Amino acid sequence: MEDAHHHHWTMVERRGTQLWASGRPFIIHGFNTYWLMSFAADQATRLRVTAAIAEAGLNVCCTWAFSDGGYRALQTAPFHYDEDVFRALDFVVSEARRHNMRLILSLCNNWEDYGGKAQYVRWGKEAGLDLTSEDDFFSDPTIKSYYKAFVEAVVTRINTVTNETYKDDPTILAWELINEPRCPSDPSGDTLQAWMEEMASYVKSIDPVHLLEIGIEGFYGPSIPELLPVNPDEYSGHAGIDFIRNHQAPGIDLASIHVYSDIWLPQSIKENHLQFVDKWMQQHIDDAANLLGMPIVVGEFGVSVKDGKFGNEFREDFMKTIYRIFLSSWKEGVIGGGCLLWQLFPEGAEHMDDGYAVIFAKSPSTLSLLANHLRCLEC
């Protein structure tokens, strides 16, 4: 682990398929806690933000730097931002730095949680645009201008706590264009590809230094048909996503995938899930290393224990499988990057649990697993 107090806190950079910082390899051993900004916006819950960061014992957190419309929105309307909520994001970034933790900041959502592309399309309709689908988010010029303005506002933000511009702050490991984008209205992938290329270029024009990832789940698309059987189902190949083609967009630095076999696979035979995870991970690692030449970031992975179909024992077997495959490839020098669990919570945030949350105080065996993976990375 880096220590910002004893080492110069430098940007994480990409060297081929590896990540480096402060003159040595950097491996992501991280987690997701998406609600940090919204909790920081309320004095009653702000301490849980510090707890989430300080108690994790990991080195990277992925969190949402967006909240579009609705309660305590950061973006209240196109080109209009709530300064109090922006200051909450400032607090999150400053707390991460204080605890030697890097951040991956996501800039939008494919889903309706915290607004997302649906909210952008609603704003467009309110402005008189002739929009027929949420997928118009990816193609309408006016909607794209809304997104670009928001991205610029975040990336060029001067942190009121540290007085450092976000685009100059090494606490931020990477920007994420959008969480889990899909565009099923154009299964060819052309619409989403054009959007990714345009937005990657735009982000890099403002901030050429920070790393950039897309945020896709990693489904294979029509550009390489022989890889379609790796997908969990036939629908995945028609979602407008194309793992190889998407990551060939200029400006993208990290190959991002998610792993949710409990959602993607209909059956509950545990061994089938672990076999799928093994194949899914291995194929993407091979492709990231050999076809794309970039690190892989398993940006989200987890198992819900909410409905009783799977328990904590299986969740831990699932996690061990993810970590084992990544660790093996990294030790062999094949790939760098890392993995971020969905999700890790301090006490007092249980009401935000979607079934996937690992609560610090209630999950000693899972925390032991996380600590063991850290030891393996450091040995």
Swiss-Prot record:
Q: Which residues bind substrate?
A: 64, 179, 260, 342
Q: Which UniProt keywords apply?
A: Glycosidase, Hydrolase
Q: Active site located where?
A: 180 (proton donor), 300 (nucleophile)
> Where expressed (tissues)?
Expression not detected.
What's its EC?
3.2.1.78
The Gene Ontology biological process annotation of the record reads: polysaccharide catabolic process
The record's listing under PROSITE patterns reads: GLYCOSYL_HYDROL_F5
Per UniProt, what is one GO molecular function of this protein?
A: mannan endo-1,4-beta-mannosidase activity
Q: Catalytic activity, per the record?
A: Random hydrolysis of (1->4)-beta-D-mannosidic linkages in mannans, galactomannans and glucomannans
Which InterPro entries does the UniProt record give?
Glyco_hydro_5, Glyco_hydro_5_CS, Glycoside_hydrolase_SF, MAN-like
An example of a Pfam family matching this protein is: Cellulase
Query: Which PANTHER family does UniProt cross-reference here?
Result: MANNAN ENDO-1,4-BETA-MANNOSIDASE 8, PTHR31451
The similarity comment for this entry is:
Belongs to the glycosyl hydrolase 5 (cellulase A) family.
Indicate what this protein is called per its UniProt record.
Mannan endo-1,4-beta-mannosidase 7
Protein species of origin: Oryza sativa subsp. japonica (Rice)
